[in-house]
């Protein structure tokens, strides 16, 4: 059996092979492009002059239009600033994680893996009978008829993952190794969510409270960004982080207050499932995201 140092050496060597196989572009170029993309995405949310809050239908519709324009513009950054050698040997859609090879695996496996992570919260929701609504046709009609639901479950995951993963990761991966890239792009993603501080201040929230909430939001969006970027690099598919993002938006952060309001036996079972889900997720992440499962030899070699 191989000892830990030998395994780590193999991983490092493998990572370097993948990194060196991608033609390189200057760090300043890739980072600058990502910075501009982040500014464009956030800036597009505020180009409209409005007195309404972010949940007003008019505001939501205008922001749909704005981020759609950014989604159209973002691929041009990848096309014009990527290495010509890379563009000549790899189909452009593949760079963006748009390909058919390994697609069904990218749809099913990362999503199932994330469901495992939320095993505890799902159990708590089942005790509140909220799961039954998922089998009600009226629930889905109402959901797709709600512009807020569509924003949170469709537009936000689609636009954010396409811009911050499909269009940033290909650039960053041409300047950094996969593991480093996974930890860089989420910082842009986390910082991009700090604009909510200004929104809260405009609603009359105290500065200290707005900053505290903003810091907390930066932390959890950045942590999610690590996971999402990891999925993109390992699977080579943008669909994986899009679906996982939508699911996480639906679940939200675990409601610990709801957990402690459960009966004792349900609370014990829920805590066990919280721990089992997390441990199982940690154990399965490297196995379930093995690049060979997804025919991914571009960003992270098997």
UniProtKB/Swiss-Prot annotation:
Keywords: Endoplasmic reticulum, Hydrolase, Membrane, Protease, Transmembrane, Transmembrane helix. The record marks 245, 249 as: Transition state stabilizer. GO terms for molecular function: metalloendopeptidase activity. InterPro entries: Rce1, Rce1/LyrA-like_dom. The keyword Zinc does not apply. It is an enzyme of class 3 (hydrolase). It catalyses: Hydrolyzes the peptide bond -P2-(S-farnesyl or geranylgeranyl)C-P1'-P2'-P3'-COOH where P1' and P2' are amino acids with aliphatic sidechains and P3' is any C-terminal residue. Signal peptide: none annotated. It is found in: Endoplasmic reticulum membrane. Its EC number is 3.4.26.1. It is a multi-pass membrane protein. The chain crosses the membrane at residues 27-47, 64-84, 104-124, 171-191, 212-232, 236-256, 268-288. It holds the Pfam family Rce1-like. The active site is at residues 160, 193. One of its GO terms (cellular component) is endoplasmic reticulum membrane. Belongs to the peptidase U48 family. Protease involved in the processing of a variety of prenylated proteins containing the C-terminal CAAX motif, where C is a cysteine modified with an isoprenoid lipid, A is an aliphatic amino acid and X is any C-terminal amino acid. Proteolytically removes the C-terminal three residues of farnesylated and geranylated proteins, leaving the prenylated cysteine as the new C-terminus. Is able to process K-Ras, N-Ras, H-Ras, RAP1B and G-gamma-1. This is CAAX prenyl protease 2. It comes from Drosophila melanogaster.
């Amino acid at each position: 059996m191989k000892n830990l140092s030998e395994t780590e050496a193999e991983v490092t060597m493998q990572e370097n092979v993948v990194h060196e196989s991608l033609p390189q572009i200057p760090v300043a170029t890739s980072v600058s492009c990502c910075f501009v993309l982040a500014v464009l995405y956030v800036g597009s949310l505020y180009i409209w002059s409005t007195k309404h809050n972010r949940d007003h239908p008019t505001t939501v519709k205008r922001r749909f239009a704005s981020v759609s324009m950014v989604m159209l513009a973002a691929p041009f950054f990848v096309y014009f600033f990527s290495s010509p050698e890379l563009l000549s040997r790899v189909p452009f859609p593949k760079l963006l994680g748009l390909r058919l090879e390994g697609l069904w695996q990218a749809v099913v496996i990362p999503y199932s893996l994330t469901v495992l992570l939320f095993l505890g919260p799902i159990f708590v929701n089942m005790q509140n009978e909220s799961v039954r609504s998922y089998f009600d046709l009226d629930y889905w009609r109402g959901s797709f008829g709600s512009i807020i639901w569509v924003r949170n479950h469709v537009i936000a995951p689609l636009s954010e993952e396409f811009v911050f993963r499909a269009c940033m990761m290909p650039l960053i991966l041409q300047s950094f190794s996969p593991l480093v890239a996974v930890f860089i792009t989420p910082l842009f993603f986390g910082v991009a969510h700090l604009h909510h501080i200004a929104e809260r201040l405009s609603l009359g929230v105290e500065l200290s409270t707005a900053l505290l909430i903003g810091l907390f939001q930066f932390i959890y969006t950045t942590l999610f960004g690590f996971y999402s970027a990891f999925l993109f690099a390992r699977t080579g598919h943008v669909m994986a982080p899009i679906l996982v993002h939508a699911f996480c938006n639906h679940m939200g952060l675990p409601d610990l207050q709801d957990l402690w309001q459960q009966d004792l036996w349900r609370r014990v079972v829920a805590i066990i499932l919280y721990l089992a889900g997390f441990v199982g997720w940690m154990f399965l992440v490297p196995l379930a995201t093995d690049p060979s499962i997804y025919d991914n030899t571009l960003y992270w070699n098997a």
